[in-house]
Amino acid sequence: MTTDTDPSLDAHLVVDQGTFRLDLTLRVAPGEVVALLGPNGAGKTTALRTLAGLAALTAGHVTLGGTDLDRPERRVWVPTERRPIGVVFQDYLLFPHLSALDNVAFGPRRHGVDRRAAREQAAGWLDRMGLADHARRKPRQLSGGQAQRVALARALAVDPALLLLDEPLAALDARTRLDTRAELQRHLGDHTGATLLVTHDPLDALVLADRLIIVEDGRVVQEGDAATITARPRTDYVARLVGLNLYRGAANGLTVLVGGTFPLATAEQHHGDVFVAFPPSAVALYPKRPDGSPRNTWPATISGIQRHGDNLRVQLDGPVGVAADITPLAAAHLHLVPGQAVWATVKATETRVYPCSG
């Protein structure tokens, strides 16, 4: 359950690291799960470390539940151990010399709970995670999925106002990730505090998060729910993330001029600066110019071929770069190889056009 009022987290993160500057505003409501996505070096982990108190703000503030945790201009800074925050790191960082039970009990103990009560709380959390029978095991005796659940239990055992998850599923194999993602979704649904999930995996974000924030070069480039972002990507990175070809151009009626030279026919009238998007599955390939050519037809050269699920993803160079998805049977029939010349077509009805502004 989410709310749009009284946000649990209200932060403006300005962090200078050499020539890189993170300048990011975050608001996360109680019960809301927000995913922070972006390419490597975008500033995602820096943001998480700053919220946790592991990196210093240059300017801005971190306010949680109405209380300032970090505000340089007022010389306010709350140490990491005193922040009501739970963190699950990418490699979990379980204490190797402690049992699963004592790893989870560490959080309550750090907050002043006596040893017996802390272990009782920890046992309850392990039971909720389905790990009651693993309480005495050391981290080296746990599978990746089990270690992830112990780390999550340790973070949740302190009843955090803010839960920070740094690539929590990245270290798992495909099968374990599938099962653990479903379990994580259930536990996040029960968490009443705010949750910020840092991930590079769009599936993790789409399954686990209520809202997505896309960061590139230290700044927010797009924000919204999954449906909005997947329907209207605004950068090349976001387009790749959601699996679309994306172009920016000038619209004049039913034509969009891309790059000042390449016209794309569309099915709806637009005017001014627009984005044009279409899925790789909308691109058809031919060995020669097809008869009765669709309005969008152009020569291209294959620059790469790779497997993409049950299909092949073909990268094309030409007037515009484009990705096309075709079946292995179609690729064999066309004898496709890198460097080969082909013709690409896209129906106007397959394109999606929307304004650059708004």
Describe the role of every protein-language-model region.
Residues 52:
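Helix-to-loop junction immediately C-terminal to a conserved catalytic motif
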Residues 37-39:
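The feature captures the beta-strand-to-loop junction immediately N-terminal to the Walker
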Residues 84-86, 94, 99-234:
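ABC ATPase nucleotide-binding domains
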Residues 12, 230-253, 277, 296:
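C-terminal boundary and immediately downstream tail of ABC-type ATPase nucleotide-binding domains
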Residues 60-72:
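Conserved ABC transporter NBD signature motif
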Residues 45-48, 150:
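ABC ATPase nucleotide-binding domain helices that frame the ATP-binding cleft
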Residues 24-35, 95:
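Pre-Walker A (P-loop) beta-loop-beta motif of ABC nucleotide-binding domains
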Residues 259-306, 328-358:
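Glycine/charge-rich catalytic "coupling/switch" loops of P-loop NTPases
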